[in-house]
């Protein structure tokens, strides 16, 4: 049956039994396809019936469907003609793991960061009103923890202020990555269905207000009494007191019930909340039984067991997790904060070991940062573990609430640099540029697991400024020993006997391994290279200017955007120190990258050992540091 669905129109003629059969097919399709490619399995298994109902009730793309935390949009993609592309999910030139405007007219926003959908919906509804398109509904699907983010409530406050047709579907599965926390999560759990409430209220309003002379006065009196009773007995007043209609809660796995609720909501032509209760991982036992994350996201897995087909090598996240626990055992002032991601950021083990020193604040990065400031003011040392891409959301709080007060807060930025398959929204290629403008900020970029542990310890010893440790997604690899350490900077390689000090190659973090390969390739061409790892990359260590002065060319290699990155900072430091040595930088161009593997993205932008070797050869030849012709040497490098 799924093969016959080319678009939402193909759903309209289906009976309830056919819809139930189709839902089963969709789940089996998702399980087998995502098992082969990796992706967000649990969230999509939970929204099958909901997505079917949405496309039967609303006319997409005439009525925009906006999925908050867009990893819930796989079923939406299937129902809008993209089922045949799922073998390429999250692969280069393949199907995106999130809504994508370039894929389909049914995808309105490239949504993947949480809590933004309601603001998009508010803006679209206003635009439709101003341009005379009053017959268009805007539907925002929120949930998977998104309502723990403050941006949702800012949007709700605005949406409720006008009578525009915005339908807000709360997909209440009680979770984001981990179980959703906080007062709002408790509030949703308390809600109960009140059949006929809105119909009776509307009929009563018309009848009482229709009374001559005293009608409006009587209505206001009755409304006040009703509001008082409702406040005492009915927990959905959080929504209704904002001026939002409320429908629910509805069994999110009963397609007929969800469809009926959505049709009811559509008829209001006003802002309305439809509360749908779903189960993350529905229909797949390994996901339902995964109490930690209900298979929120997975790699390639065995369908029968739900287990990964390959044993994962030690990763950066687990290395951080182990180190933090060790430091936490020695120091009771160390506390940890996550924004709804204890597992992905490596804090689950710390939570289990030190539950009273662990705080999950929900999807609320701004609050996390300022709460950390308060903890630091109280004499503790907070460690805020967060994906690099989500740091952008808390920049003002970092600047004004933490750095301005010179507070000892340590940021641990996971998934820094190019992450790959999750695409533009999840690459952490801005953090060095952002952190570089924060006064007093100190940033470390460990090259391996040993340095991660070491630099984390050094960060925890800082008591007069914020610090950050950044590392990428993936395997941590083997430790890379230093030849020597000079004033805090590790020297990883020096020119071989007989070669001059031609190039100082400054490697940022894990790019140290690539830099060593580049140095060896250049050595074979008679170019002497010194490879250094600054360890603490911001502010630029003063000793780097001394290293630079002893070489003919400085080259920086970093997993960050070139604008405002370490290359820019090193160049500025050389100018300030009046060291007149040319400086070239290798990094990421200032653009958004489509989804692909990390290696594919880096290759596309020329950040490979071969290409860097060719570039440096040309630069050295242009400086006259070697008599070899640049083109000739480049050919030999190939």
Curated annotation (Swiss-Prot):
Xref: SUPFAM superfamilies: Thiamin diphosphate-binding fold (THDP-binding), TK C-terminal domain-like
Residues the entry annotates as binding thiamine diphosphate: 71, 112-114, 145-146, 173, 284, 365
Pfam families: DXP_synthase_N, Transket_pyr, Transketolase_C
Disulfide cross-links: none
Keyword Disulfide bond set for record: no
Organism superkingdom: Bacteria
PANTHER family reported for this sequence: 1-D-DEOXYXYLULOSE 5-PHOSPHATE SYNTHASE-RELATED, 1-DEOXY-D-XYLULOSE-5-PHOSPHATE SYNTHASE, CHLOROPLASTIC
Binding partners and assembly: Homodimer.
Name of the featured protein: 1-deoxy-D-xylulose-5-phosphate synthase
Species name: Mycobacterium sp. (strain KMS)
Lineage start: Bacteria, Bacillati, Actinomycetota, Actinomycetes, Mycobacteriales
